[in-house]
Design a protein with these regions (language model features):
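Hydrophobic transmembrane alpha-helices of multi-pass solute/ion transporters
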Residues: 1-18, 162-230
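Alpha-helical transmembrane segments of multipass membrane proteins
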Residues: 29, 33, 63, 126-134, ...
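Transmembrane-helix boundary and interhelical-loop signature of multi-pass inner-membrane proteins
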Residues: 12, 33, 37-42, 108-109, ...
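Juxtamembrane and boundary regions of transmembrane helices in multi-pass small-molecule transporters
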Residues: 46-47, 111-202, 317-350
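Membrane-embedded alpha-helical segments and adjacent helix-loop junctions characteristic
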Residues: 1-75, 218-277, 286-287
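Alpha-helical transmembrane segments and their lipid-water interface positions
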Residues: 20, 24, 67, 71, ...
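Internal alpha-helical transmembrane segments of multi-pass membrane proteins, especially GPCRs
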Residues: 16, 20, 46, 89, ...
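Membrane-interfacial helix-loop connectors
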Residues: 62-99, 103-121, 248-326
Length: 350
């Protein structure tokens, strides 16, 4: 009975902590939809996969979301035609590479500024490498969920319009953007889950460009779309929080902590602990600070770098974009790179 009470308390704390950031991510996703010209966004993204992954990793400075809110924004990037390396880089690095988290880490480790610097450097490096690795997969069908793949197939990123193109191309662009406004925004393709065929003759008269709407109408659409996505993602977040709480209660934490003495085992323990506790990146530095006297600096960095990338609460959200095999590869690559980087620190630096 005591474990049940503890589990319920942890579940509520995770949910209360995560929901505001999920709401922020959904709101940013809606703002991207209605106020960002996706054609210009795609045009400005680097075509080089390595540079694109690096740029995507640094976008977190502009969109300060944690691991609870980065998934909706990364999904919006993908369906707006942003290259996969950019989206992957943002997905993995945004929870760490943002001003709020950097400030919180500096506050916690004021006496160890190298922790702050290395957390940013390692997060950028790992996200860039993984994004670059995924750039070799040209066909996205094996990576993303079928609904995402269908949408990207029927709504390819718009190209700069040439003089020889008529009004049909412009109408298609407007329909492509506003296709996301229908019911089932997050699932894609409306109530039936079927992508809308983009054809100038089939565009309803209500689908007019958002650029022609007044600010009040745009804001109303932003609110409506945010409510729709929050309703669809909230249930997934609740399930993920419940799983994370169950793991925290049932996992033998005393055994895990007792293994944190060696340079290798301490990193493994903190990697496992990062997955188990599923704490938000805005406050995880204070949690890691409590282990500073017993764990090596490399293992603390492993917790601070790997934790925001791999959060149990967000696995359900990621499954709405990627297939399970893709998420496994993301997790495995992130764990291996984090282990190698932090082990080098434990053996040769600290």
């Amino acid at each position: 009975m005591n474990e049940l009470n503890n589990g319920f308390t942890i579940f509520l704390s995770l949910l209360v902590e995560a929901m505001p950031f999920l709401l922020l991510g959904v709101l940013l996703s809606s703002l991207l939809l209605f106020f960002v010209n996706e054609r210009k966004l795609v045009e400005k993204m680097p075509k080089n996969p390595l540079l694109g992954a690096l740029v995507g990793s640094m976008i977190g400075f502009l969109f300060p979301v944690c691991e609870c809110g980065n998934v909706p924004v990364a999904r919006r990037f993908l369906i707006q035609g942003v290259p996969m390396p950019v989206a992957i880089g943002f997905l993995l690095a945004a929870p760490t590479i943002n001003p709020v988290v950097i400030w919180a880490t500096w506050t916690a480790f004021r006496d160890q500024p190298e922790i702050v610097v290395l957390r940013v450097v390692f997060s950028l490096a790992i996200a860039t490498i993984i994004g670059f690795v995924f750039s070799f997969q040209k066909d996205l069908n094996p990576i993303v969920q079928p609904a995402i793949a269908r949408y990207m197939k029927y709504n390819p990123p718009t190209q700069p319009q040439t003089k020889g193109r008529g009004k049909r191309s412009q109408v298609q662009q407007e329909a492509t953007v506003l296709n996301l406004l229908q019911s089932g925004t997050y699932i894609l393709g409306g109530k039936a889950g079927i992508p809308l065929r983009i054809d100038a003759n089939l565009v309803p008269p209500t689908l007019i460009s958002t650029s022609d709407k007044p600010i009040a109408a745009k804001l109303r659409l932003v609110v409506d779309n945010s409510i729709q996505e929050l309703r669809e993602l909230g249930g997934v977040m609740i399930l993920g929080s419940a799983i994370a709480a169950a793991i925290q209660v049932l996992a033998p934490r005393e055994l895990i902590l007792s293994l944190g003495a060696g340079p290798i085992t301490s990193i493994v323990v903190m990697l496992i602990l990062a997955v188990v506790v599923s704490i938000c990146s805005t406050v995880d530095s204070f949690f890691a600070l409590s282990f500073a006297s017993t764990f090596s600096s490399g293992s603390l960095l492993a917790f601070l770098v790997f934790g925001p990338m791999i959060d149990i609460k967000s696995v359900g959200l990621m499954l709405s974009i990627f297939k399970p095999k893709t998420i496994f590869y993301l997790f495995a690559l992130a764990a291996q790179l984090t282990f190698v980087f932090t082990l080098f620190l434990n053996l040769h630096v600290f």
